[in-house]
């Protein structure tokens, strides 16, 4: 098994972090996905903020018995700090809808759409959101040569944090026939767009601002670059002409609203160098809440400190009937 693959865990781990408070929050983190460690680190700051805000907090590292554990602890709200499979893909929201427990972040359909790169792409294009050319390749296709003219990007269908993403440049010693499909039997092959990496934080339908990511070491914004200090600079606000900056925010709000997202989200774009054309990459319905994370940074620029950001997210908690 690849170290980043989903792994099955039978029992949840439950820890009481604060036994008194105005409401009982179950902070859901960890879990069984490839992004487990990112989720756990994100939850550290969230738990401190929740306690500071006066909530009773129970931490749950989610396992397969999660429904039973939720029945036992009876939270008023679930703060969904999970990333990846089961938490970000609509699985947990579906369970919480059945149990009628209010939860933060997006619901079943929005989460599932955003998590699956094929279906989110169809949704984007249907709503006239510009994207790079791409094709879907199945393992059973047994493709021996490059499926697209280089440079191109290989993306697993349902991984976040750039896990499994590879950029194949013209000079790379890479044979597609040797690609082992480590994250499932399908991948998206996407045209590589050379340009500026732009990220927008959206909260409750309103774009808070945008930043630009300047790579310092690696060739693209991969897992290592995202979570290692010194691998990238964040320019906040993104140094763009006013009209282009405004367009970026409007496009992000459009994506958020057409997908019926809830709470926080992060929209990702590439601004092509030669044409100044915006290409949407994805929308992330479970953006990280770590010290290096983008949404808290943009929120701070917009005048919302981390604790207040968590409070605003809590206010959106609901279930779908």
From Swiss-Prot:
Entry binding sites for Mg(2+) 2: 282, 284
Note describing how the cofactor binds: Binds 2 magnesium or manganese ions per subunit.
A Pfam family recorded for this sequence: Dala_Dala_lig_C
GO BP, sorted A to Z: cell wall organization; peptidoglycan biosynthetic process; regulation of cell shape
InterPro entries named in the record: ATP-grasp, ATP_grasp_subdomain_1, D-Ala_lig_Van_CS, D_ala_D_ala, Dala_Dala_lig_C, Dala_Dala_lig_N, PreATP-grasp_dom_sf
Family: Belongs to the D-alanine--D-alanine ligase family.
Disulfide bridges in this chain: none
Gene label: ddl
Name this protein carries in UniProt: D-alanine--D-alanine ligase
PANTHER family associated with the record: D-ALANINE--D-ALANINE LIGASE, D-ALANINE--D-ALANINE LIGASE B
Entry annotated with the keyword Ligase: yes
Pathway: Cell wall biogenesis; peptidoglycan biosynthesis
Residues the entry annotates as binding ATP: 147-199
Subcellular location as annotated: Cytoplasm
GO molecular function annotations of the record: ATP binding; D-alanine-D-alanine ligase activity; metal ion binding
């Amino acid at each position: 098994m690849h170290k980043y693959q989903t792994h099955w865990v039978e029992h949840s781990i439950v820890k009481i972090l604060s036994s008194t408070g105005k409401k009982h929050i179950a902070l859901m983190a960890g879990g069984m996905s490839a992004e487990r460690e990112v989720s756990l680190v994100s939850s550290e700051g969230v738990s401190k903020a929740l306690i500071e805000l006066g909530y009773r907090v129970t931490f749950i590292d989610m396992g397969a018995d999660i429904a039973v554990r939720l029945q036992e602890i009876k939270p008023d709200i679930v703060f969904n700090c999970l990333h990846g499979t089961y938490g970000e893909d609509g699985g947990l929201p579906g369970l919480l809808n059945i149990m009628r427990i209010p939860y933060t972040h997006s619901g079943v359909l929005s989460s599932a759409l955003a998590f699956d790169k094929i279906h989110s792409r169809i949704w984007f294009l249907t709503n006239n959101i510009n994207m790079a050319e791409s094709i879907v390749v199945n393992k059973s296709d047994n493709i021996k040569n490059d499926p697209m003219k280089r440079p191109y990007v290989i993306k697993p269908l349902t991984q976040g944090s750039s896990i499994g993403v590879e950029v194949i440049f013209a000079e790379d010693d890479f044979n597609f026939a040797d690609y082992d499909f480590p994250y499932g039997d399908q991948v998206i092959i996407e045209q590589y767009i050379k340009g500026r990496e732009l990220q927008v934080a959206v909260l409750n339908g309103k774009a808070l601002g945008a930043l630009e990511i300047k790579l310092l070491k690696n060739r693209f914004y991969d897992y290592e670059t995202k979570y290692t200090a010194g691998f990238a600079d964040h320019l906040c606000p993104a140094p763009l002409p006013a009209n282009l900056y405004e367009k970026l925010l409007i496009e992000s709000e459009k994506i958020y609203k057409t997908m019926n997202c809830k709470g926080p989200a992060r929209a990702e774009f590439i601004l092509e160098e030669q044409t100044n054309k915006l290409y949407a990459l994805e929308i992330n319905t479970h953006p990280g809440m770590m010290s290096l994370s983008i949404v808290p940074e943009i929120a701070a620029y917009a005048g919302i400190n981390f604790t207040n950001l968590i409070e605003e997210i809590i206010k959106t908690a609901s279930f779908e009937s």
